[in-house]
């Protein structure tokens, strides 16, 4: 949390490429083979490195960066030609896609560990910064023209969480609020505005191809479609040439092209030839194109003069410069440049440092030379139609059987715990034992089976199966224990008696339909739920019949809260509302109850502190009591039988320390936090009913006697990354 952590892909590339030079082979193959041969072992990477190469992950890391530091120290220190204009920062910060609003004001996207993604204004005269508005997850860069800002954000499908689209966002500058435009549909990328107010953008189609669309007020909608082998990664509008320009990626590499919509159909023309040189963040103005390119070995700002077709590098950076955008007069470009504490907003005077000649690949400056692999170049491999037909005959296509692929055992743990609880609320209720974990390749089913042994000598077996392939999600959980189940004898009037015998089991079947209603900075959801619970708690009726405890619960929950920053422990603002009802349709001994619950998130006294207030109220519809309260109960109480119940709580959550310390290969402790809690409950205890909490002296209370519960305390939470798992 203190500093930027590169992705495991970036780090892994450097480790593997160094090992390839050091040991003259690709170590990933040996590690993968060893892992598949010995899946029962946990630290397979460490064991394989020691077995085959006599090294360890720590030693490999140190050798890799010792070699890289020697290379980097040998490079000339170029300094930074861009002049940083963003205010100093105290934490890792990312500025991106700066835009000129006028000669003295920049509009920039900003995100840091303390705050979520947002637009900020930077005054170039005073250096002051002002937050304009918070955004959702931005998918493609913003564009400003004539007082309007357009960009796109990711948006989840209402029903399918894994289905994510990109939607147009529009903000009138000065309103400090924006809206998502659903009328243009999904798959919208890289929107731009013309001087006439027309809108154009790239659209990704579900069949895999891209198109450029112009939505003109006078001419309607014009489109030009690209082959499926071509993907588009940028769009810009040039006011001088009155054309659109795009970045295309094909089998031949990346290139820049143009589209002229002056006719009835879009006429496409090339600007640069394809090359395996990465270019990004295209913008345009006054007959010039601006973008960043890896041509020189580091990302630098480039420009193309459309009148001559010549390309120039216009920045010289120590670590790279990105996303150039021209000033109104064209003398400067606003861009971002990288430093140790993040990406800074900077200005670069447009001066030609170097004319760029076409080259098939970029210069290799910051990476050590790679050893050539003795494998054919994929572009040189010819797969004829005859070979394709022969392959199809040998391996004919078959219908994928979902039922036959529900289970895929992939992991195990030498302890008993509930993987679903660990993923949902970070609760690790570990015991001695073992757990098997399964997830199918489609991600539509999850399953686990665990055996646990408690210190008091009891065994527990828990199995869970969840299916997410339909809109309503279904979860089935079964638990068996040799711990005796409870028997309540209501036939022993006037006093109920309770005793334990045999084994115990619990079965839960839950179906719910999460409706995702998120938009921008706010996350919203509506979740109706239906759940059936059955256990072998035995209830002897006054007539002497034996009933099992079973409950049917129905609830509707609505959530709304703002997106969290990286260091936030909980949302800064938000609330949850839930209405529930529960009954036992198979026994008259249980009442039907209803409950309402609410929770509110607010900021605390300091940054990343949070206050949570919650309350619940429950009533039964007749005189029979419920065994359990539906919503939350004070800590230390898990069974309260009552006809009327009210509870409230206040929790103050805050970080205590960021150790950034651990035991290599075992765990890494990132943060320690503390939750101070106060809880209160008032309920009416029923007459002649056994006190299941065991707090009463003789175990009996009278109906209607009000009871009050006060609890307070604290809970310490450890934010841990175990076993070298990626931080993100």
Regions found by a protein language model. Name each.
Residues 29-147:
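Beta/coil-rich, acidic/histidine-enriched accessory regions frequently appended to metallopeptidases
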Residues 82-90, 128-133, 177-182, 220-226, ...:
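A short beta-strand motif characteristic of beta-propeller blades
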Residues 91, 293, 354-471, 475, ...:
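Outer-membrane beta-barrel initiation region
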Residues 92, 110-119, 134-139, 152-168, ...:
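A flexible loop/linker signature enriched in serine peptidases of the S9 family
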Residues 158-159, 299, 318-322, 340-343, ...:
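Outer-membrane beta-barrel translocator/channel fold
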Residues 185, 317, 404-455, 476-482, ...:
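Transmembrane beta-strand segments that form the barrel wall of outer-membrane beta-barrel proteins
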Residues 303, 433-440, 459-479, 500-517, ...:
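Feature captures outer-membrane beta-barrel proteins of Gram-negative bacteria and organelles
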Residues 478, 491, 545-678, 682-702:
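C-terminal outer-membrane beta-barrel translocator/porin domains of Gram-negative envelope proteins
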């Amino acid at each position: 949390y203190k500093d930027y952590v590169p992705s495991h892909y970036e780090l892994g590339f450097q480790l593997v490429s160094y090992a390839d030079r050091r040991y003259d082979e690709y170590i990933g193959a040996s590690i993968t083979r060893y892992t598949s041969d010995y899946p029962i072992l946990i630290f397979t990477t460490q064991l394989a490195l020691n077995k085959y190469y006599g090294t360890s992950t720590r030693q490999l890391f140190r050798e890799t960066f010792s070699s890289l530091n020697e290379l980097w120290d040998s490079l000339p220190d170029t300094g930074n030609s861009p002049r940083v204009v963003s205010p100093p920062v105290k934490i890792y910060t990312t500025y991106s896609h700066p835009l000129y609003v006028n000669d003295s004001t920049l509009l920039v996207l900003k995100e840091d560990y303390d705050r979520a993604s947002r637009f900020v204004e930077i005054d170039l005269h005073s250096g002051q910064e002002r937050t304009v508005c918070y955004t959702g997850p931005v998918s493609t860069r913003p564009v400003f023209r004539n007082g309007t800002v357009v960009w796109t954000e990711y948006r989840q499908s209402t029903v399918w969480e894994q289905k994510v689209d990109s939607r147009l966002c529009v903000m009138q500058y000065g309103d400090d609020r924006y809206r998502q435009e659903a009328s243009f549909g999904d798959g919208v990328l890289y929107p731009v505005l013309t001087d006439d107010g027309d809108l154009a953008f790239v659209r990704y189609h579900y069949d895999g191809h891209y198109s450029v669309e112009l939505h003109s007020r006078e001419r309607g909608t014009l489109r030009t479609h690209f082959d499926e082998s071509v993907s588009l990664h940028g769009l810009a509008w040039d006011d001088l040439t009155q054309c659109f320009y795009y970045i295309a990626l094909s089998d031949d590499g990346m290139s820049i092209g143009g589209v002229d919509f002056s006719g009835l159909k879009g006429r496409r023309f090339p600007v640069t030839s394809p090359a395996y040189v990465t270019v990004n963040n295209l913008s345009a103005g006054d007959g010039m194109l601006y973008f960043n390119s890896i041509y020189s070995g580091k990302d630098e700002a480039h420009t193309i003069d459309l009148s001559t077709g010549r390309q120039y590098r216009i920045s010289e950076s120590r670590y790279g410069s990105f996303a150039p955008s021209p000033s109104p007069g064209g003398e400067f470009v606003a861009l971002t440049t990288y430093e140790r504490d993040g990406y800074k907003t900077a200005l670069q005077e447009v001066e030609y440092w170097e004319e760029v000649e076409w080259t098939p690949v970029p210069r290799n400056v910051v990476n050590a030379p790679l050893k050539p692999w003795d494998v054919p170049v994929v572009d040189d491999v010819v797969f004829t139609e005859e070979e394709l037909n022969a392959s199809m005959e040998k391996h004919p296509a078959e219908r994928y059987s979902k039922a036959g692929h529900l289970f895929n055992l992939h992991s195990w743990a030498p302890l008993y715990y509930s993987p679903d609880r660990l993923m949902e609320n970070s609760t690790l209720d570990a015991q001695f034992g073992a757990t098997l974990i399964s997830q199918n390749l489609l991600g539509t089913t999850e399953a686990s089976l665990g055996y646990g042994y408690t210190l008091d000598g009891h065994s527990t077996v828990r199995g869970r199966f969840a299916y997410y392939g339909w809109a309503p999600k279904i979860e089935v959980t079964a638990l068996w224990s040799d711990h005796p189940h409870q028997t309540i004898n209501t036939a022993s009037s006037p006093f109920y008696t309770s005793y334990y015998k045999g084994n115990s089991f619990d079965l839960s079947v839950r179906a719910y339909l999460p409706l995702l209603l998120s938009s921008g900075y706010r996350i919203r959801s509506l979740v109706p739920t239906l759940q059936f619970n059955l256990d072998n708690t035995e209830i002897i009726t006054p007539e002497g019949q034996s009933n099992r405890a079973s409950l049917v619960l129905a609830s509707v929950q609505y959530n709304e809260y703002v997106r969290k920053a990286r260091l936030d422990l909980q949302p800064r603002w938000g609330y949850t509302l839930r209405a529930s009802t529960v009954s036992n349709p198979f026994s008259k001994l249980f009442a039907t109850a209803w409950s309402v619950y609410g929770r509110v998130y607010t900021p605390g006294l300091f940054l990343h502190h949070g206050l949570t207030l919650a309350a619940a109220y429950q009533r039964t519809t007749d005189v029979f009591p419920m065994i359990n309260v539906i919503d939350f109960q004070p800590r230390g109480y898990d069974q309260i039988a009552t006809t009327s119940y009210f509870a409230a709580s206040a929790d103050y959550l805050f970080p205590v320390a960021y150790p950034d310390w651990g035991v290599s290969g075992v765990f890494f402790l990132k943060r320690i936090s503390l939750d101070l809690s106060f809880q209160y409950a008032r309920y009416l205890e029923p007459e002649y009913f056994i006190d299941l909490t065991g707090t009463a002296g003789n175990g009996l209370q009278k109906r209607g006697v009000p009871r009050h519960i006060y609890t307070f305390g604290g809970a310490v939470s450890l934010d841990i990354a175990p076993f070298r798992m990626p931080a993100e």
